């Protein structure tokens, strides 16, 4: 610091010019970096700002045309998609309505068929179509049909048992009925023949062996 103070003003200016010349020489040595905008110093030794990048006008115009074409293509796609969405939006309510109508018609046919079947079932079940009985519900009709079927099954089972019992009894009684009666048996049951002519009451009483006429009611009556 003492040496710098001892220097005069002219000496200080000469020293500053020598530093500036040294800076120019250094900038010339860094030529490639200077062309890239890093090296050259101004008259006061300051480095200049980096030059702004320049894009060719043809490139700018081509990019503008491309962006315009892309915008038009995007607009066409948007319009096409919008028209398709609008058509789908108009078509969807019609399809939904037709589908709903078909489902309702199918359900209506199913209920009609079910009601017809239940009416036919009520017609063959006793106590279900009497004038004093109101129309049974679906569940009541099915329960009554179930009970009626069970009752018929029990009746058929009892009938089978009865038929089997009768067939077994006929098998046991057949030999007894087939045995012929002996003459003694015939006399014991019917002592006179079919060709014997019966006379008055005393004569009829006399035809029986061992039967006195006093026991005959007609013979004991007075005339």
UniProtKB/Swiss-Prot annotation:
Transmembrane segments: none annotated. Residues 98-152 form the bHLH domain. Expressed in brain and retina. SMART domains: HLH (SM00353). Residues 32-93 are annotated as: Disordered. One of its GO terms (molecular function) is DNA binding. InterPro entries: bHLH_dom, bHLH_transcription_factors, HLH_DNA-bd_sf. The keyword DNA-binding applies. It comes from the Eukaryota. The keyword DNA-binding applies. Keywords: DNA-binding, Nucleus, Transcription, Transcription regulation. Pfam families: HLH (PF00010). CDD domains: bHLH_TS_bHLHe22_bHLHb5. One of its GO terms (cellular component) is nucleus. Disruption phenotype: Disrupted rod signaling and profound retinal dysfunction. Its main location: nucleus. One of its GO terms (biological process) is negative regulation of retinal cell programmed cell death. It is found in: Nucleus. May function as transcriptional repressor. May modulate the expression of genes required for the differentiation and/or maintenance of pancreatic and neuronal cell types. May be important for rod bipolar cell maturation. This is Class E basic helix-loop-helix protein 23. It comes from Mus musculus (Mouse).
């Amino acid at each position: 610091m003492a040496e710098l103070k001892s220097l005069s003003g002219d000496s200080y200016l000469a020293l500053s010019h020598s530093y500036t010349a040294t800076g120019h020489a250094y900038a010339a040595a860094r030529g490639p970096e200077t062309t890239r905008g890093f090296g050259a110093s101004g008259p006061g030794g300051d480095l200049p700002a980096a030059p702004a990048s320049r894009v060719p006008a043809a490139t700018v115009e081509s990019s503008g045309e491309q962006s315009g074409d892309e915008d038009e293509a995007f607009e066409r796609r948007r319009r096409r998609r919008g028209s398709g969405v609008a058509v789908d939006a108009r078509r969807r309510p019609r399809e939904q309505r037709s589908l709903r109508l078909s489902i309702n018609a199918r359900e209506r046919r199913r209920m009609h068929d079910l009601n017809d079947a239940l009416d036919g079932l009520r017609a063959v079940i006793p106590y279900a179509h009497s004038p004093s009985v109101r129309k049974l519900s679906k569940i009541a009709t099915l329960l009554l049909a179930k009970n009626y079927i069970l009752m018929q099954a029990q009746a058929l089972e009892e009938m089978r048992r009865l038929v089997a019992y009768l067939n077994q009894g006929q098998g046991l009684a057949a030999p007894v009925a087939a045995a012929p009666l002996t003459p003694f048996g015939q006399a014991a049951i019917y002592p006179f023949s079919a060709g014997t002519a019966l006379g008055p009451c005393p004569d009829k009483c006399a035809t029986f062996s061992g039967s006195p006429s006093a026991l005959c009611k007609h013979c004991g009556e007075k005339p």
